[in-house]
Regions:
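Active-site-lining helix/loop region of Rossmann-like oxidoreductase modules
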Residues: 9, 13, 151-275
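C-terminal helical cap and adjacent loop that interface with cofactors, partners, or active-site loops
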Residues: 272-303
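Gly/Ser/Thr-rich loops at beta-strand to alpha-helix junctions
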Residues: 12-14, 82-83, 107-111, 137-143, ...
Length: 303
C-alpha cells in the first residue's frame, strides 16, 4: 500500500504543528509545503520542532509551483478562519484533483453562514472526484460534534450548554490578533463595537451543527456576547504578551433560540497562560433532558 502524499498549505503555528504530528506517523509522506515571502526556498524543518535527521528535505514553495494535478493525495489547508477567504484556495486544490482538509473555523459547518459557497464547494468536489473536510478541535469537535454524540443517549433533549475554558498560549499571531491579546480594554471595546475584533470564530457553525443534528429549527439568528479578560499580572505566551491591566483573553458566549426559547448556549472564555492566575481549563457538555448529561473533561483537550 502506498503512503498518503500530503501537501501542507501554511506553515504557521497550526501548519507547523500538523507537520510535527505527521512526521511521527507511518504511511504518510509530506511531499510539499506552500508558503510565501521569505519562507519560499527554505526548509520546512527550519520552522518546526522536529529535527530533519536523515529525512528528505522539504522546501517551501509557492502555490503556483506546487499546485499541479494530483501532486498529492490531500492538501492540509492551514490558513484563514472564514469560508469566503478559504474558498479560492479550496477551489484551486480541488480543481487539481486533490482532497482538502481545512482548519478554517467556519469550514467546520460552512452552510451555517455561507450556504451558497458550501454548495459550490460540494459541487466542485463531486465534479473532480475528491472530498473537502473542515474540522478542528473547536469548532469541529468539542463544542459541536461531541455534543451531538452525547445527545445520542437521550430520549429527549430540552436544552444544551457547552462550555470550553481553554488556553490560547499555543496559538499563533493570527489568533492573538483575533482575540485582542495585548491590547487595552478601550481598544478591545472599540473593536467589539466596530466589528474589527473577531474573537472566537465558530459559534454560528457549532450551534448550527447541533441544531440540525437534533432537528431543531433556529427561530432567530445566532447571537453572541464578547467581554475582555483583563490580567492583573504580566503574561507571555510564545506568540502573545499582555501586560498587567491589558487584555489577556476574550470571554464569549453564543446563543441559539428555537421558537423564541434559548435552547443552545455556548460559553467560551479563552486566554493566554490561564494557569498563571489559577484558572483551570476544561471542557463541559451539560444536557438537560432524559436523562440529564453532565460531561466534564479537565484539563481541556488542547487545540
Amino acid at each position: 500500500m502506498e503512503n498518503v502524499k500530503v501537501i501542507i498549505w501554511g506553515l504557521g503555528a497550526m501548519g507547523g504543528g500538523m507537520a510535527d504530528m505527521l512526521l511521527k506517523k507511518k504511511g504518510v509522506d509530506i511531499v510539499g509545503v506552500i508558503g510565501r515571502g521569505s519562507k519560499i526556498g527554505t526548509s520546512m524543518f527550519d520552522y518546526i520542532k522536529t529535527e530533519r535527521g536523515d529525512r528528505p528535505d522539504v522546501l517551501i514553495q509557492s502555490e503556483e509551483d506546487l499546485l499541479k494535478e494530483k501532486a498529492a493525495d490531500v492538501v492540509l489547508l492551514c490558513t484563514d478562519s472564514f469560508t469566503k477567504d478559504a474558498f479560492p484556495k479550496i477551489k484551486k486544490v480541488v480543481e487539481c484533483k486533490m482532497n482538502v482538509v481545512s482548519s478554517a473555523e467556519e469550514m467546520a459547518y460552512p452552510k451555517a453562514q455561507s450556504p451558497e459557497l458550501a454548495a459550490e464547494i460540494d459541487k466542485l468536489a463531486k465534479e473532480n472526484g475528491v472530498s473537502v473536510l473542515g474540522t478542528g478541535i473547536n469548532p469541529g469537535l468539542i463544542m459541536d460534534l461531541l455534543v451531538v454524540v452525547m445527545t445520542g443517549c437521550c430520549e429527549e433533549v430540552e436544552s444544551i450548554l457547552a462550555r470550553r475554558v481553554n488556553s490560547l498560549s499555543p496559538f499563533g499571531p493570527a489568533v492573538m490578533h483575533e482575540q485582542g491579546i495585548g491590547i487595552t480594554v478601550d481598544e478591545f471595546n472599540k473593536g467589539v463595537e466596530d466589528g474589527t475584533l473577531a474573537g472566537h470564530v465558530g459559534f454560528h457553525e457549532s450551534i448550527g451543527m447541533v441544531a440540525d443534528a437534533i432537528g431543531w429549527k433556529l427561530s432567530a439568528p445566532v447571537t453572541q456576547s464578547m467581554e475582555p479578560i483583563v490580567t492583573d499580572v504580566d503574561r507571555k505566551s510564545p506568540y502573545g504578551f499582555a501586560k498587567a491591566g491589558d487584555v489577556a483573553g476574550c470571554a464569549m458566549k453564543g446563543f441559539g433560540y428555537v421558537d423564541g426559547e434559548l435552547k443552545i448556549e455556548m460559553d467560551h472564555p479563552q486566554q493566554i497562560e490561564p494557569e498563571q492566575v489559577g484558572v483551570q481549563t476544561g471542557d463541559y457538555v451539560i444536557i438537560k433532558g432524559t436523562p440529564n448529561v453532565n460531561m466534564v473533561n479537565s484539563p481541556e483537550v488542547p487545540g
